[in-house]
Amino acid sequence: MAALNNVGMVDSKDYTIVTSILREFFTQKGFLEVHPQSRLSILAACEDPKTIATYNYKNDIWPLPQTGQMWLEYEMLKDPERAPGYFCVSTSYRNEPNPVPGRHEIIFPMFEFEIKGGIEELEVMESQLLEFIGFKLNTYDNGETYYHGDDYKNVAVKYGVKELENEHEAQLEKDYGPVFFLKNFPNYTSPFWNMAQNEEPQESEQMKDTAKKIDVIIHGMETIGSAERSCDKEEMRRQFETISEGEYSQILYDKFTKERVTAELDEFLKFDFFPRSGGGIGLTRLIRGMKMSGLMPSPA
């Protein structure tokens, strides 16, 4: 096959090992698996509109999916008592204009999840997942275990910048080890429009205008991106229209028409919302991180 056709390929044995571990963790908790890849949507597919690729199906233009998380959220919202959570294995298409070799994949597999509860429950669950996979915990003097983490603004101050870049993620490994929880992202980093905002205490400059978002950095790369979802319908609509200075919504309107996009948004906002959280795991990066930590079997 031509080299181009190898884009996004993952070793089958590595893929089987990692997805089996992840499925075991979530099914033990009673989660249900969803197949979002065959579902058509605009909003549920688009995470970064600047990297959208499209296709024509039945005379309509659709985005190649970048995430399945809103479909997991849909399953949770339409029947809240059915399961404690949902997960899926999906393919993310990112038409990166300037991909960094070894860091950016333009097509890659993801494992995504949705749980009940807010950012505190999310952080606990992700810590449990990493421990289940085998990533080493740190230990306090009193015997309690933990993974290193801090708020985005604190880390930015530490490195003397406003926005963290790839080199700062790499530095986190040197400073703190293989796992770091980066939390509470400022709104100027353009968190996704349905992420919950930190509202208390607003008098704290540290938490002002920040989203309840956690990126788990594994061996210097963002490997899990996650957040608490918003329950505020008006705030979600406002964020949708204003993130990236309005560029996010305008790109979607230009590509798929304002009528279609607004119809999907209106339909989503009809749900009765409750505290919930979710995230996506880049499988190629998780495989990389597991190999670097000696958590993958040696090649046969």
What is each PLM-predicted segment?
Residues 1-51:
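TRNA-binding/sensing appendages of the translation machinery
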Residues 34-37, 140, 300:
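Residue-level detector of family-conserved "landmark" positions at structurally sensitive sites
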Residues 50-117, 149-300:
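A translation/RNA-centric and nucleic-acid-associated enzymatic feature enriched
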Residues 119-124:
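Short, conserved charged micro-motifs
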Residues 125-134:
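Short amphipathic C-terminal alpha-helix that caps PH/PH-like domains
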Residues 134-147:
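Flexible helix-coil linker/hinge segments at domain or subdomain boundaries
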